Amino acid sequence: FNLKSVYSHLAASEDQRPSQSCDQQIALFEAIKKAHSVQSSSIPKFHLLNSSGVFNYPELQYDMVRCGIAFHGFANHPKWDALLKPIAVLESRITQIHEVKKGSYVGYDHGWKAPVDSIIATLPLGHADGIGRHFGHHKGSVFIHGEEAPIVGNVCMDMLMIDVTNIKCKPQDTVCFFGATYNTAASFSKQGQSISYEILSGLGPRIKRIINE
């Protein structure tokens, strides 16, 4: 058989250099590469670096690199993130708005109790779409007309609720979960103690994809 490529994946490519773990892995990869160059009649392509590796080990690009999250504008380090531009935007629209009296409950398991008379909007995204339950109970928030609205109560399978008491809005108004210029996917994911990889790769198939070239 003809060997086309040999690759590895650094386990801690974003760790500050020098990294003993990465250095050991790189040394082993170099030894394998050298053995192939001596013993093989056809030299396969070698690649080692993911997005973080491209920035942290630019001298090890070999024949190709595997940029994944960097294509979305993230690189796991503030210094590297500053060199990239986030491109992913997740928006939805308000489906319903309800007035909720003080002391009333919202969501499964009475997840949120209105401390005052409130206005609650419903959005048609839930954990089946990749917005996990860990964003509920005021941990996550969205933006309407540039104003921040917290997610209240439990995130449901197909919907979630936000507090818009102090925001002028109506059904069908656009809601931004994360954008390219503010509250990026990295920022939004941190609200739920997650990472941009998880939120971007976990968006469900019901969410319409629009690609702008």
Question: Which residues does each predicted region cover?
Answer:
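Active-site loop/helix belt of alpha/beta enzymes
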Residues: 1-93, 100-101
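Small-side-chain structural scaffolding
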Residues: 8-13, 49-53, 88, 92-95, ...
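C-terminal accessory subdomain/extension
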Residues: 99-213
